[in-house]
Every structure is written in structure tokens, then in C-alpha cells.
């Protein structure tokens, strides 16, 4: 015997199912459920009078030793690069072990193998919540330790970059130079509930100092113009990267002193490289570094200060740039340097290139013109602006923006994971990946995650007054949870290093407690591997007007006057 209930009642109880649509925050972006992996009539739900009770949705015979889940997230709406689906998510030992239908196979039909709910299983109610992978920020200036708190509170669970604190070099460049500095930053990483990896300084025309840093634990090498991004440096750094299977990251020569963009492309010589702020406002060959996004071996990213193009973007950038790159308003050449980087034409084109899937990654450039807590917000603001200005993508329809949503979520999850050699352990909601996950109320999607899981344990969450009688009284704001403390922190977060550093026992020598994981497959990849962000049109820049064309089409758009996901959500 079956009972039919109204769709509205079903959604209220169990969350949206196939055909239901959900608005993302206060944007114009609508996603639609493509598939439901749960079984109608056999849904599991926790609570008084609900189904996750002994002998019902919870198996009385399932022990942890014989495979019961440690944690199940019930009836969540997963938004990931591979799909928009409704499912239960099963977690054991901090890793995702199942995406499907969880429950008690003794009495329920369709329980996915390995997704048995037992007495050992904790429950997070995912009904009417959106589940995404934790964000990855691959361009972090480690200027202050507090940025880790702001990142995880925003839904970012992995930070890659360089720095040693507010040193002048770190304020400008994402490099942790030398074995001693790397060792100290690897040790400092023990205290933060996020995955961390550090870039060595890649500016050396001879390889010895570069090898030294990789073997000391660097997970990548960063070339920055403030240290000299010459063709000799580029070639040397890429040779070492190929030798050790790590990524090279580059901020090219804005002043075109040692090379023009054509010379940099020639020095790269078809080898894989991750180009930072590829539009150029953050730095790089003026005015045409954006051309490099045409190259199939280039993994192009943006930083969030130019995401998206608004009426405030140009004015804000000049002062930020002067501070970040140790420039003086009293030196005319410094002012000219700054002004050469800020071009409304290329920033406008950057919006469209993201929407086309030409630019593949969005990161922060934290405290060095970018904001570490706004990677996710700025990504979805860009998607919204492009929906409003360009309409549905060819792959979408008037009903939903599913393809656009999947393309944009990939920009801060799977694409940086692939680019940096992390995708074997993080970057998506897939079986076998570390359970770094974010749960969002749709009205707060991309702005304030309800719960952030690190390695399967709640590390941050919206929480009310700790002295209240229930968890919900004001003030409600993101607070560190038990996954952010003690040995639980080191057991649920990773440290990314080179395979050479692992082989040399560097984590053990430094007394590192958290698990160190080697980056891999950084060199045999190209833009074609960056999910849903693979386009390589021919890009041209007019040297007089700075107009940008892709395959002959002029790329231009108006700056936004207002944006969603902004003042409506924040008091300050």
C-alpha cells in the first residue's frame, strides 16, 4: 500500500526531489534536481517519530566493525561539478564511502552497499540543505594566522600559498622562501582546522635552491615578478617542477622589462603552469597577459578583487596595489606601474571568459588585494552577473542554470584540486574523497555555511548563545566546533607536501602530527582536464584600446551597480 502526498509536503519533510527547483541565495541562479538516489517511501530521517530508530531505518545488528557508517547526512541536495542530485551521504574514517540510499537493509529496499545505519552512526539532517565540497583557495598570502578562521567560516577548507606572516616579501608574494621558513610554516600549520600547503620561492635561474625547497616540503614553486619573472627563471623552475611532479605558479612581468607575453609563452614552452590573476589587475604583462588563457598547457585562475566587475572595482584597486607591492605615491614610476595594471576593458572581459569556461579557477589573493573569506561569494556573484547580462548558457534552459552552477562550483573545488595535484583526496563530493563538506541553507548559499565538516567531523558551524537552553538563540554566528580542537584537528586535516619531502621523512623530522599527503599528477595535465572549464579560444588584446576579443568576438560588459549576496546578509 502506498500513500501519495502533495509535493510541497514531501519537500517540507524530505527536501526537494527530481524536478524541484531551488534559488541560490538572493541571486538569479536556479538549480533543478536532476536525480534522486533515495527511495520513495523508504527515506530515512532522524527525530521523534521518524525512521532512524532501532529496528526501523537503523539496523540493530550493524556494528562499526562490520561496516556501519560513522556519519550519515540524510536527504541532502548535492551540488558538484558532476551533477545536482538528492542523496544520502555516508562517511567512515573521515572519508566519503557512499552516495546513495542509506538505512537498514534488513527491512528497507534499495540500501546502497556500504551505507548501513547502525547504533554507531551519527546523523546530520541534510533535508532542505545544499551540500558542496569544501572550497580550495590556491592563492593565499599567509600574512596572518587569523585568515584560516575566516576561510573555514566561509566554506573554504583548503589553503595553498606562501608567506611567513606580515614580512614585506609575504605581503606581496605568495612564497615561503627556503627550507628553514618552510619548516616553521609546516609546524605552524598544526594549529589550524584546514588543509594546508606551502609554495617555495621559484625565482632562481639555477636549480639547486629550488630543489632544496621542494625537498624541504614545498608543494609547489611560485614565480613572482617582485623577485624577477625572467625567461631564465621560468625555464629553471619548470625543469625542477617536472623533476619533482609539483606545480609551478606564476605572476608575470607587468613592466615587460625582461620579457613580453610572447617571450613568457616561449619560455614556458608547452609545459604545464598555473597562471595567477590571469587578467592582469593583480599583476602580469601589461596589457595583454590575458592572452595566455588561450594556451592548452596553461591553467588560468583569477583572484577575487576583480570578481565580478563593478562600479567600484577600478577605484578600489589603485590604493590596494600601492600598499601590497610596496610602492610609493611620491614616485611617478610607481604610480605609472600601478595604473598600467588596472584596465576596465580586460576586467570586463574576465567576467565573460569565466562564463565561457576559459578562465578555470577563482582564488583569493588574501590580504594582498583579495579577501580570504570571499572566494565563494565572489564566484557566485560573477555567475549571477553573467546570468543577468548574458542570459542562459547554451547548455541551460529557461527552467534552470544547472550547467552554469556546475561550471562555477568547479572553479573553487575540483579545478584547483586538479591543478595543484590534490584531486586524489579532495575537491569533490565523490566516494573515496576526504569528507571536507559544506552544508548550506539555500537562502544563505555561498554566503554563510550552516555546517563545515573537516575529515568527517564538524569543525565550524552557525551556533547561537552557548549559555542558551537550545542551540538557536542569538547571537548566531560561525563558531569553531570540536573538529577545530586538540588531536581531532590534526586527525581530520591534511598537510600537502612534495613526494620528495615524504620520502625524506620531513614531516617526521619536524614532529608533524597531521597526515602529510604528497601532491601528484601536476605535470601531465592541461586545461582540458579542468572540469567544465576547458575552453581555449584565440584571445587578442588591442594594445591601444585594451579591447579583448575571443575568436574575433569583442568581450565587453557593463560593471554591476548592485550585487546579490552582499549587504542583505551582513551588518558590517
From Swiss-Prot:
The superkingdom listed in its UniProt entry is Bacteria
Going by the record, the broad EC class of this enzyme is hydrolase
Tell me the route in metabolism or biology where this protein functions.
Nitrogen metabolism; urea degradation; CO(2) and NH(3) from urea (urease route): step 1/1
Cofactor section = Ni cation
The UniProt catalytic activity note for this protein reads: urea + 2 H2O + H(+) = hydrogencarbonate + 2 NH4(+)
Primary localization class, coarse: cytoplasm
Listed as disulfide-bonded, the cysteine pairs are none
Q: Where are the annotated coiled coils located?
A: none
- The UniProt record gives the binding positions of Ni(2+) 1 as 139, 141, 222, 365
Catalytic residues, per the record, are: 325
Gene Ontology annotations of biological process type: urea catabolic process
Q: Where does Ni(2+) 2 bind?
A: 222, 251, 277
EC number per UniProt: 3.5.1.5
Any Pfam family matching the protein: Urease_alpha
Swiss-Prot/TrEMBL keywords = Cytoplasm, Hydrolase, Metal-binding, Nickel
Keyword Cytoplasm on entry: yes
**Domain Urease spans what residues?**
134-572
Give the record's family classification. Answer: Belongs to the metallo-dependent hydrolases superfamily. Urease alpha subunit family.
Summarize the subunit comment.
Heterotrimer of UreA (gamma), UreB (beta) and UreC (alpha) subunits. Three heterotrimers associate to form the active enzyme.
* The name this protein goes by in its record: Urease subunit alpha
Q: Which gene encodes it?
A: ureC
